[in-house]
């Protein structure tokens, strides 16, 4: 049976992540409060951010930048700015 969480991003009950995907306290917070659906949405945004900013994920500054954007997106409902991207109409 799938684990469910009240997703803070989507503001609804949804299937939770199968395991902690990110290390540390932030990872625990994500595991406890973010759904698979919201995590999948973040992964798409993350890919766009990495490409747009030409981030090298071996660099600590790039990882810190992405972590800041991830936390803001998942918990503070702050949409990352991706130049030239127009979200689809709902």
Swiss-Prot record:
Species the sequence originates in: Alteromonas mediterranea (strain DSM 17117 / CIP 110805 / LMG 28347 / Deep ecotype)
A single GO BP: cellular response to oxidative stress
Region forming the signal peptide: none
Annotated GO MF terms: iron ion binding
InterPro entries in alphabetical order: Fe_traffick_prot_YggX (IPR007457), Fe_traffick_prot_YggX_sf (IPR036766)
Family per record: Belongs to the Fe(2+)-trafficking protein family.
A Gene Ontology term for the protein's cellular component: cytosol
The name this protein goes by in its record: Probable Fe(2+)-trafficking protein
